Amino acid sequence: MKISKVREENRGAKLTVNAKTAVVSENRSQEGILYNDPSRYGKSRKNDEDRDRYIESRLKSSGKLYRIFNEDKNKRETDELQWFLSEIVKKINRRNGLVLSDMLSVDDRAFEKAFEKYAELSYTNRRNKVSGSPAFETCGVDAATAERLKGIISETNFINRIKNNIDNKVSEDIIDRIIAKYLKKSLCRERVKRGLKKLLMNAFDLPYSDPDIDVQRDFIDYVLEDFYHVRAKSQVSRSIKNMNMPVQPEGDGKFAITVSKGGTESGNKRSAEKEAFKKFLSDYASLDERVRDDMLRRMRRLVVLYFYGSDDSKLSDVNEKFDVWEDHAARRVDNREFIKLPLENKLANGKTDKDAERIRKNTVKELYRNQNIGCYRQAVKAVEEDNNGRYFDDKMLNMFFIHRIEYGVEKIYANLKQVTEFKARTGYLSEKIWKDLINYISIKYIAMGKAVYNYAMDELNASDKKEIELGKISEEYLSGISSFDYELIKAEEMLQRETAVYVAFAARHLSSQTVELDSENSDFLLLKPKGTMDKNDKNKLASNNILNFLKDKETLRDTILQYFGGHSLWTDFPFDKYLAGGKDDVDFLTDLKDVIYSMRNDSFHYATENHNNGKWNKELISAMFEHETERMTVVMKDKFYSNNLPMFYKNDDLKKLLIDLYKDNVERASQVPSFNKVFVRKNFPALVRDKDNLGIELDLKADADKGENELKFYNALYYMFKEIYYNAFLNDKNVRERFITKATKVADNYDRNKERNLKDRIKSAGSDEKKKLREQLQNYIAENDFGQRIKNIVQVNPDYTLAQICQLIMTEYNQQNNGCMQKKSAARKDINKDSYQHYKMLLLVNLRKAFLEFIKENYAFVLKPYKHDLCDKADFVPDFAKYVKPYAGLISRVAGSSELQKWYIVSRFLSPAQANHMLGFLHSYKQYVWDIYRRASETGTEINHSIAEDKIAGVDITDVDAVIDLSVKLCGTISSEISDYFKDDEVYAEYISSYLDFEYDGGNYKDSLNRFCNSDAVNDQKVALYYDGEHPKLNRNIILSKLYGERRFLEKITDRVSRSDIVEYYKLKKETSQYQTKGIFDSEDEQKNIKKFQEMKNIVEFRDLMDYSEIADELQGQLINWIYLRERDLMNFQLGYHYACLNNDSNKQATYVTLDYQGKKNRKINGAILYQICAMYINGLPLYYVDKDSSEWTVSDGKESTGAKIGEFYRYAKSFENTSDCYASGLEIFENISEHDNITELRNYIEHFRYYSSFDRSFLGIYSEVFDRFFTYDLKYRKNVPTILYNILLQHFVNVRFEFVSGKKMIGIDKKDRKIAKEKECARITIREKNGVYSEQFTYKLKNGTVYVDARDKRYLQSIIRLLFYPEKVNMDEMIEVKEKKKPSDNNTGKGYSKRDRQQDRKEYDKYKEKKKKEGNFLSGMGGNINWDEINAQLKN
């Protein structure tokens, strides 16, 4: 039972209660609590009594729908055998009901209490291994009642009830199939199944002997326990109360892995085992490699003992110092069988008998279980009898690992989806369990390190203190850490990783246009200023001086200003003023680089010395920001003009609207439905024409270009409405009340009689009318449910804005439907429909109603458009800028804040899509943090974490939002001057030739392009698109692909636009212009032509080019996210490991514990190793080490890369290490040590964007290596690699079927000659060769039906395949699946099989049934007897 997703009934509609769990501090101890979401009930928190009563109520309500058998409603069953099985199940469940129908029909409360007491006693007896069923006399009833109760649950009563309802004779095979296929999962225990089988065999008078089974004890009693949720009732409450965070402070002020409450004093053996494991974690953290090796060998012997028995050679010689990793590798290929698999069941046609396969799978699970029990028992016995020191001296620790192994095997067979020979091998199981154990230990150290970093390092950057102490828990956390504190850590880490990705792309975009890097200096941000000279030769530039890498110093400023709209927009900006005193454009580039570098150095948890320093030209950056805000006001106005609004409305009306919308800078709230969700673009024309809405009509009867101008009008109106929605509607004070009135209209006047009347009418209505009435009833109930929820939110939170109301509704909706890591495809959404869809739908409907009313009341001029000539651009509101100053306050704050300048510069070097995603993520972060503080406050929990609800790195998050929002509006806006982006027309024409086949003849590119564009395309229509007569036309997508894409990559994966593409575009444009503004089209051909026209438009305008570039960026961005995730986990692992080492009894040198630095700035660091580890990973934090030349202690400046700092850490470690490598201590359980250099190489390859410079491996190859190497310490992350890859592509409507194949990987690198040391097999991600790629389908409504159209055509899918495989060659002949069949409809029951299909099959089957009845050989419950010869023939075949 998922407490976090509890639902309660509300007049037929389901309503989210959102009862959640949390960990809070109670009187210097931690306790799990259950609380209701405060957004619904205000301050609400449950005590022990409330919690138990609440859980009991939830469990009891679920019992009303209890069924022993699940009914497979979605299965297409057309053969007699399958219909028979399902009919048997329905009869048992619905007509017979076994015990439950009798129990639920008893009105006497005493009966109910007695049944419940009986179930509790039965569970207690079973736990205490007491044989026999409990006596009803002990359940608080008299003797007569006890006898009656015995009769109800007697085996005889069961048998009689079955015979009375199902009087057919069935075979043993049929019973096996029913149990295997339909039995409720919680009842799938071997003895329960055997008890049920015995009962059914007796009921059908079939011979069956199983003397070991007592039907009442092994089936009936267990059903009662399951029905009353006895086990869950006792365990759910206890698990909530005992819930805790991974790490908590102990009494001595140190962190420790948490264990269950009770401890060894209570005699709790499991707690004693966990205490032994805590001791193991402490002891394993040793700098002595011999100690760690010995402990790993002992653990390894336990695994070998469990799977191979005590006679294995590795257990014979206790003194053998074997290598555990070599043993692990050797046993992985062991083909010995852990269990003997039963033979697969095949039908005569060669296909698998699915029902028989279910039985086989259950048999396999039981074989696994029995073998696991046997292994467990012999392992326990061997450990108890061992006197030779093979295993750990602590018996409780041995038992802990044995229990972990047992649980690991159980988990494998419990989740078995398919029976495979591979998973039945001892080699697979034993080494899977070994890796699980290693992962488990690694994750514990990571959890410890995370707690240390966040709660015990307050003085990490106290640079003004001469003595600091690290590893000491902050006083405010001594009483415990709440779950809300941990949630804030999660929010902070996500923000840091996402920001790191955007910083990497900003650096990449700036450097790709300005410098040419080499392999030794591949990090642009680490290049030194132009004045940096060589240390050994002061007359020579340093090797990493930025001057050595410039592409073209003369055009440097113009190159940079490409990202700011083009240099033509900056002609009046006084660069000379800000670059005076010997500064030039190289200093300008260095300033931008330093801003981005400082952003990369930011840690939002600790302020380093490089944090907020602003060592760049702050005046220049702030002046640029101010200049762009002035430009922004012009951009706002120009967008009105470019969207043709002055063609349909008066300039005076538009001027008033412009001032009203943009006089203030408006923040967009997160989780509020976007405008294009509220108003779907394709339906927009019909909606605004509707007289019940706005009734807008544009008179174009005399217009020769009616179709084209009508399309312009609706596009203009759509843009205007979008701007009003975000800048006026959502922030209007009266809109909240308007929305509430609309949303609660039905709830305020809800009539139960109307509901009953509709239900009565449905019963007597015909099929067509019944469908309409049922839809009317569902809408009525849903509107009431939604209205009641809105009323409740307003009642509990009277001060909430419309945006906050929307946030809560969408948060609840998303919480119910975001449980799956893998994104749902359109087909899966039809099969597995989202819960609470009416919440989202009615939110959109009521927002739409309120918005249309808002338009009528505030902007009535919109209702009366008229067509007139478009004025000159210069005459459209020429004085607009003097009326609005939306950024006045923000300008001054940016001028005084280094932090805001960082956000400004980083966001300005992002592509439009990336800047938009960055803003969206910031909104999500802000909403998440706000929600954490809200829940913590309402549950009475004080949050001690340093993350402020309304700030990031000390600045107001609203200002950060406004800065990024400005960049979003400006990113992607380009000038109309070719010279802003290319040297001249010829260079531009040459560049566009990579993507356009303009039949270049080998001479001048510009002339060839001109001739091509002046040639005929179709009829009298010229090609024209790319030339205006005198000069080439500047294409926005070409410019964006130049700035943010990679030409060499894009030209290889795309097909060039051809003359035939342009001809098809013009033909479709002419044809579709006649019906493009209809909204809902008349025919399937019209809709498909519109879709095809949009595809061709995207091709000829190079929009697809930006699509491919964005997909590549998303794939690269995810890889960068992973390297920072892994680096964070590595830091936390090392912190946790060395924190344990600091606090155990192992030998440690003085400088490991305390570092007393005597230099320019004397400093003493207690907990030195913790500081040094943090300094390795936190940019800007200096690291102390012994200089290799002077052998004196020195301190770095903290600005080196992590790789350089690791070298410094090694020199620090030489001051105390004796027998081992301090950096690598314990690392053997985090990663494969032999692959460390390969992992480092992969990390640098990703971070430095080497894919785009070398193209020596494919994206699939990189993702495969990340899957294989990166996350060996956490299998959860590893499994998510292909899932996230799938999700990225699905966001672009591309479905890919990935599969794993065997590949090769390199182990180790000879750093001198770069030769590969060793080759080894590995898993590789690829795409299924046949039907591996297919498009999502869009659903379009027609006037008389529905049509499904592929979202992506074959050409697009081919480019995606090339994108994933480039530079590898791939055969795409059969890889793309063209879906001829329709997408599953809305009434789908699963796997593309609709209710209509099922009804048709049922009609056909009814005819078949009537025929069988006449022959006297069908189900007697349906009017005949079964022809068992026919059934058995089906079974045999």
From Swiss-Prot:
**Documented activity regulation:** Target RNA acts as an activator for non-specific ssRNA degradation.
Where does the record place a coiled coil? none
GO function term, MF aspect, one: endonuclease activity
Where are stretches of biased composition, namely Basic and acidic residues?
1394-1416
Cofactor binding summary note = Pre-crRNA processing is metal independent, while crRNA-guided target RNA cleavage is dependent on divalent metal.
Alphabetic keyword roster: Antiviral defense, Endonuclease, Hydrolase, Nuclease, Repeat, RNA-binding
Q: Does the keyword Transmembrane helix apply?
A: no
- Note the CDD domains from the entry: Cas13a
Where is the stretch described as Disordered? Answer: 1377-1419
Q: Where is this region: HEPN-like fold 1?
A: 460-626
User: According to the UniProt entry, what is the EC number of this protein?
Assistant: 3.1.-.-
One GO BP annotation of this record: defense response to virus
Provide the leader sequence positions.
Answer: none
The domain of life is Bacteria
Q: Which InterPro entries match?
A: Cas13a_endoribonuclease (IPR053395)
Cofactor(s) demanded:
a divalent metal cation
EC main class here is hydrolase
Task: Map out region (HEPN-like fold 2) in residue numbers.
Answer: 1101-1437
| Comment, domains | The target ssRNase active sites are probably within the 2 HEPN-like folds, and the 2 folds interact in vivo.
Further remarks about this protein from its record: Part of a type VI-A adenine-preferring CRISPR-Cas system.
Which family would the database say this protein is a member of?
A: Belongs to the CRISPR-associated endoribonuclease Cas13a family.
Summary of the function given for this chain in its UniProt record: CRISPR (clustered regularly interspaced short palindromic repeat), is an adaptive immune system that provides protection against mobile genetic elements (viruses, transposable elements and conjugative plasmids). CRISPR clusters contain sequences complementary to antecedent mobile elements and target invading nucleic acids. Unlike many single-component effectors, this CRISPR-Cas system targets RNA. CRISPR clusters are transcribed from pre-CRISPR RNA (crRNA) and processed into crRNA by this protein. Cleaves linear target ssRNA in a pre-crRNA-dependent fashion, preferentially around A residues.
Q: Which NCBIfam families match?
A: cas13A_C2c2
Tell me the protein's name: CRISPR-associated endoribonuclease Cas13a
